[in-house]
């Protein structure tokens, strides 16, 4: 069973992923600025107090693992390049410890060349550019950092997130083509875990 280095495990989606991964008997090392927010207990869980912007603490989290899962994101007061700099730290630690693959969660506003955004999609992206340019620019930059790395990577772009119970069925695709416009966090966590299980 793969050992997971988890970043962002105390957020709403992170908690869903952590619980599901532990239920599937994965061993997890989670980095948390506030370890008390990790309200799950398991012999397969190790919690490390630290910050994704601290290279040494990221390195300690990645050591002894097989794959990195990055679910952290901006909150009020976050540094401008939180996702980019945190991702760079994770990639550096992965290189040090021979970890080959990272899965990174981002928002549906992150553009991709296979997207065919409809009017509503374009409107949402325009709103993001105006309302939260820091978040969108950081997401774009973090994607470029992943693309320029020599690690295997998967970027999961989540649409509007809901708190509905897990359904077990959801659509995956490109914006405006065949992707869902919303998804429950539990189903999103399920999809992310499936990417952990994939070998490519």
Say what each PLM segment does.
Residues 87, 138, 156, 180-193:
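Substrate-positioning beta->alpha
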Residues 43-65:
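Conserved Rossmann-fold cofactor-binding substructure of NAD(P)-dependent oxidoreductases
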Residues 62, 66-69, 103:
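N-terminal Rossmann-like NAD(P) cofactor-binding module of classical short-chain dehydrogenase/reductase
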Residues 4-24:
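N-terminal Rossmann NAD(P)H-binding glycine-rich loop of SDR-like oxidoreductase domains
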Residues 165-168, 195-200:
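Glycine/proline-rich active-site loop of Rossmann-fold NAD(P)-dependent oxidoreductases
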Residues 31-36, 51-52:
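N-terminal Rossmann-fold cofactor-binding loop
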Residues 75-104, 134, 141:
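NAD(P)-cofactor binding segment of oxidoreductase domains
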């Amino acid at each position: 069973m793969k050992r997971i280095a988890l970043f962002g495990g105390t957020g709403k989606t992170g908690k869903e992923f952590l619980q599901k991964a532990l239920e599937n008997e994965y061993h997890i090392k989670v980095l948390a600025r506030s370890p008390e927010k990790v309200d799950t207990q398991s012999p397969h869980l190790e919690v490390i107090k630290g910050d994704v912007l601290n290279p040494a603490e990221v390195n300690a989290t990645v050591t002894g693992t097989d794959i990195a899962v990055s679910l952290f994101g901006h909150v009020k007061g976050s540094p401008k390049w939180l996702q980019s700099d945190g991702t760079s730290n994770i990639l550096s630690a992965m290189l040090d410890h021979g970890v080959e693959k990272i899965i990174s969660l981002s928002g549906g506003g992150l553009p991709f060349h296979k997207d065919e955004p409809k009017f509503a999609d374009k409107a949402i992206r325009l709103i993001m550019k105006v309302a939260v340019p820091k978040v969108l620019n950081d997401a774009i930059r973090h994607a470029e950092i992943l693309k320029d790395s020599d690690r295997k990577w998967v970027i999961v772009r989540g649409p509007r997130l809901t708190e509905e119970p897990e359904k077990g069925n959801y659509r995956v695709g490109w914006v405006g083509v065949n992707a869902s416009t919303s998804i429950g966090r539990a189903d999103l966590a399920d999809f992310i875990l499936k990417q952990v299980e994939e070998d490519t």
